[in-house]
Amino acid sequence: EKHIYVSVSFMKKLNCFNTSILRAAHSESFLIFDIFFTPNACVEIDNDYGEYNASDSGGRIASYTKNNILYSTGTFRYRDLAQDPKNELGKILSIDKNTAKAKIISMGHRNVMGLTYFEKTNEIWSTEHGPNGGDEINLNDNLDSVTPTNFGWPVSSYGEHYSASSLSPEGALIVDSDDKTYNKAPLHKSHSDFGFREPELYFVPSIGISAITTIKKNFFKNFDHSIVFGSKGNNYDAEG
């Protein structure tokens, strides 16, 4: 690889932010970074959706094909953007390293934290922060399709809105189903019933899921095509 790529929160215009990529050529002395890719949209702090959170930003970069990299983008809490097929926020993108043109690989994402491509089986594995509960491990094995795979956010999630939920001393979610946030984002407890791809695994409560990678046979021969992922939080059993 001739370049170094760095993901940053970027002010595309005054008080309007997205997650973008800076790139620098390899150098043994110093690095000069320029803007390589910025999505076609940004989220204003004071927006008509009425919510903004800079931590819902995605920003994971991963190797993909010879001429492309993978990149995850968040919606900065403007949840509806994840279901807009013309908007590049709330997506996993394939970005051409020569032209910086992006193609939407999958949509319906909240906040992808881990991202890896397994070339042998042509699969993308990703991890995703849910809201209060509902952290996910997702598999996209439909990469040759013209239509992006849709993982359902914010229509479906196994978590709950922070404004409407709390954890009991035993670790169970206590939910206020009358919270008005559900009018904007219902978080149905099924993905497939609404035409979306189910997560391979999900965690309730959340575990603070983070990076993910696949194990290749030449590393551990008995674990070929296994995945390893990290967690920053609690140790709970997965479902799915």
Question: Regions from the language model: what does each represent?
Answer:
Residues 75-240:
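Beta-propeller domain segments
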Residues 1-79, 114-117, 122-130, 205-240:
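Acidic, Gly/Ser/Thr-rich repeat motifs that build Ca2+-stabilized beta-propeller blades
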